[in-house]
């Protein structure tokens, strides 16, 4: 048991070190979804046997380990990437059973260096986050491994997809994808944690199981940290999803409890926008802002795995994650008197605004440290402590005929006096940040202290 904990800790800490070193250099590029641990067969650009981690740790999988052959080569003028990875999960002590096994097979062909297009296909049997936008890794995985707190909910995805994309350098891309997937509920399992090992995990909520056909369109635009404009730029991620399928409603907040099955056909449209602006107002000061809006656009109601929420260290840290019992539930959008295991996200729409001021601190001690320098996993690391002040505001709501402060018509927006708000301060040391946040809209809520490995946004 102890050796298993140590092995898992080494993988997670390695992940945290990589993220921290990137954060310390103000790197804002999106990290790969896995951590390469190296090739076991031979050192070649064309392929080998790869072992990698899913760069997460959670109450459903524990630590997912990916293993299998990979290949990279040229096909005409295109760059070909192939991977056939099996997945074994550490939950239930790496027990060999269907819940602990999965796979991801991918084939990608990319044409062009600075601009061009790419096509690809994949088949997968994996566990996915319901709201990946709220919190970056390794923050979520570290909280689960050390503190037995999982800030995500999870569901199973089994199916295949194809995509085509166009890109220009590293700052603009458009991707169109089609997939056929079976979505399934997953339960929390026997997963280790360093502290609170005698406690129980928060229940992983039941979703609306079903077979669904999904069309996704994603647009990304990122001009952050360009050579001539460090600490400044725009970031935009815009997603549209159309889903069509048959979903099981029984035993969930969207269906009756008095029947064994209640299958309903849903055809829905969902959009999600994440807009950020980074401003360097002096050589050592930044003023950054973020606006998030997402949820139901048209068609039938959203299944549970496509619902949204706000609250917790990733969005409005002055409020505890999945906090209830403080008036109308504008965090998860649970109706009065409805208690659901795991307190799942049920909002059909959410809005979030964040503003952050950062001031880099100057110290001779830090200058001495940075002159000597150290390297973390081969990357140069420098301490650049910054004082941080921030304010957040947001809420979720349901869509339909107006009902109190929880449900609004599709063309209206809740009044700002109903939003949850907080303020906070922090010290970002580069490798990690320590923060305190206090709710403003609910003055009786206690202050929350928390640690982030990566920046808040």
Task: Provide a role label for each language-model segment.
Residues 29-45, 118-163, 193-381, 385, ...:
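C-terminal outer-membrane beta-barrel translocator/porin domains of Gram-negative envelope proteins
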Residues 391-411:
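C-terminal beta-signal and adjacent terminal beta-strands/loops
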Residues 81-87, 120-124, 175-179, 188, ...:
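Transmembrane beta-strands of outer-membrane beta-barrel proteins
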Residues 217-219, 424, 429-431, 445-457:
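Outer-membrane beta-barrel "beta-signal"
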Residues 263, 339-346, 409-418, 440-441:
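Short, contiguous acidic/charged loop-to-helix segments that flank catalytic cores in large enzymes
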Residues 7-17:
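Bacterial N-terminal signal peptides
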Residues 1-5:
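Positively charged n-region of N-terminal signal peptides that target proteins for export
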Residues 22-90, 95-99, 105, 113, ...:
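Outer-membrane beta-barrel initiation region
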């Amino acid at each position: 048991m102890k050796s298993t904990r140590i092995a898992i800790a080494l993988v997670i800490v390695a992940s945290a070190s990589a993220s921290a070193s990137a954060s310390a250099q103000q790197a804002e590029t999106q990290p790969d979804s896995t951590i390469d641990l190296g090739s076991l067969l031979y050192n070649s650009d064309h392929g080998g046997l790869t072992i990698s981690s899913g760069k997460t740790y959670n109450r459903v999988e524990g630590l997912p380990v990916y293993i299998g052959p990979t290949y990279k080569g040229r096909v005409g003028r295109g760059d070909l990437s192939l991977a056939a990875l099996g997945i074994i999960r550490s939950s239930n002590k790496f027990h060999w059973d269907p819940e602990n096994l999965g796979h991801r097979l991918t084939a990608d062909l990319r044409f062009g260096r600075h601009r061009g297009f790419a096509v690809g296909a994949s088949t997968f049997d994996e566990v996915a986050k319901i709201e990946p936008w709220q919190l970056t890794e390794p923050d979520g995985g570290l909280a689960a491994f050390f503190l037995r707190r999982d800030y995500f909910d999870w569901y199973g995805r089994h199916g295949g997809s194809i995509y085509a994309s166009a890109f220009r350098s590293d700052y603009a891309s458009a991707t169109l994808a089609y997939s056929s997937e079976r979505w399934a509920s997953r339960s929390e399992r026997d997963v280790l944690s360093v502290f609170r090992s005698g406690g129980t995990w928060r229940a992983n909520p039941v979703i609306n199981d079903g077979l669904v056909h999904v069309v996704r369109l994603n647009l990304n635009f990122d001009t952050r940290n360009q050579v001539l404009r460090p600490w400044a730029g725009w970031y935009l991620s815009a997603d549209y999803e159309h889903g069509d399928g048959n979903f099981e409603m029984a035993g969930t907040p969207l269906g009756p409890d008095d029947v064994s099955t209640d299958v309903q056909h849903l055809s829905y449209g969902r959009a999600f926008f994440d807009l950020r602006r980074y401003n360097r107002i002096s050589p050592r000061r930044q003023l950054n802002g973020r606006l998030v809006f997402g949820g139901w656009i048209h068609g039938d109601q959203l299944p549970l795995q496509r619902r949204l929420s706000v609250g917790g260290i990733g969005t409005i840290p002055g409020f505890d994650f999945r906090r209830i019992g403080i008036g109308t539930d504008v965090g998860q959008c649970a109706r009065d008197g409805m208690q659901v295991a795991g307190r799942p996200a049920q909002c059909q729409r959410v809005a979030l605004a964040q503003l952050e001021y950062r001031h880099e601190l100057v110290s001779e001690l830090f200058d001495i440290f940075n002159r000597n320098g150290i390297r973390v996993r081969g990357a140069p690391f420098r301490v650049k402590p910054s004082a941080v002040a921030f304010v957040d505001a947001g809420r979720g709501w349901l869509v339909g005929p107006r009902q109190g402060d929880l449900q609004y018509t599709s063309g209206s927006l809740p009044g700002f006096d109903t939003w949850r708000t907080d303020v906070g301060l922090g010290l970002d040391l580069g490798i990690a940040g320590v923060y305190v946040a206090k709710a403003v809209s609910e003055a009786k809520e206690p202050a929350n202290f928390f640690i982030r490995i990566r920046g808040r946004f």
